[in-house]
Amino acid sequence: FYFMEMNTRIQVEHPVTEWVTGVDLVKEQIRIASGQKLTYTQEDIKLTGHAIECRINAENPEKGFRPSPGTITDMYLPGGKGIRIDSAIYSGYTIPPYYDSMVAKLIVWAKNRQEAIRKMQSALGEVIIEGIDTNVDYQYGIVNHPDYIEGNIDIEFIERL
């Protein structure tokens, strides 16, 4: 058989998979690239808990998600048990207009979906990024929406917000 298309890079969402499986995907990818074998089999992988990822973008949801380049004047990103931030931004960093607008990934893990939602609600509520527009408040609204909390989501959920 043949591959019509193949994406050989790690996906943005890989921290979710890593947290619920306990597998360091980047480490395994490097091992494979260097000719080594995987350190586990499919049967070794057990799913544990629930993880949620929010991509924090420099964009304005109220203006059609228009990109928001500029300089970050102040910021605070949450931390703690079950919270992961993947980012390279800092206060004084300038977001250029030329690239993808994602400036951070906020990932949470908990024992179950309800706890993970509560953790994400809290974490998003703590995020401070000033000087640029972000989609943090928009995502906060999503994870606090009753339909999201109850899992009553379909392809028209975002349009109903």
Question: Where are the model-predicted features located?
Answer:
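ATP-dependent carboxylate activation and anion-phosphoryl transfer catalytic cores
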Residues: 1-161
